[in-house]
Amino acid sequence: MKGLLQRVRGARVEVAGDIVGAVDQGLLVLVAVEPEDTRASADKLLHKLLNYRVFSDAEGKMNLSLADVQGGLLLVSQFTLAADTKSGLRPSFSTAAPPALGEELFDYLVVKAQQLHGKVASGRFGADMQVHLVNDGPVTFLLQT
């Protein structure tokens, strides 16, 4: 499972012009599920997302986690993040999980995040989404389980 984490001052996701998820200060995470992923993979990614220290402390060092700053977490499914881009000029998506598994594990990740962290929003799995964000830094990390 991959999570492309971006520290944001604010972010929202829209489907057909309607806002379906939004956060203020926090993290926007684009999530890709791969064929070998399990609920344990989702649990591991979520632990990292909530505890990865990407926010500045009083001394300006990246020493605080999302949980520490009580920031928002916006989860957006993005199967293209799992693409194989090693050869040719067209991405292959054979390295992405089948849609049923992707949806099951993405939904599981969202529910677990809501149980463990107060401020969680998400996009809509499989929808054509428009994501708006104000990057903070920018600070971006690719997390993999």
UniProtKB/Swiss-Prot annotation:
Homodimer. InterPro entries: Daa-tRNA_deacyls_DTD, DTD-like_sf. Belongs to the DTD family. One of its GO terms (cellular component) is cytoplasm. An aminoacyl-tRNA editing enzyme that deacylates mischarged D-aminoacyl-tRNAs. Also deacylates mischarged glycyl-tRNA(Ala), protecting cells against glycine mischarging by AlaRS. Acts via tRNA-based rather than protein-based catalysis; rejects L-amino acids rather than detecting D-amino acids in the active site. By recycling D-aminoacyl-tRNA to D-amino acids and free tRNA molecules, this enzyme counteracts the toxicity associated with the formation of D-aminoacyl-tRNA entities in vivo and helps enforce protein L-homochirality. It comes from Pseudomonas fluorescens (strain ATCC BAA-477 / NRRL B-23932 / Pf-5). It catalyses: glycyl-tRNA(Ala) + H2O = tRNA(Ala) + glycine + H(+); a D-aminoacyl-tRNA + H2O = a tRNA + a D-alpha-amino acid + H(+). A motif (Gly-cisPro motif, important for rejection of L-amino acids) lies at residues 137-138. Its EC number is 3.1.1.96. Disulfide bonds: none annotated. The gene is dtd. This is D-aminoacyl-tRNA deacylase.
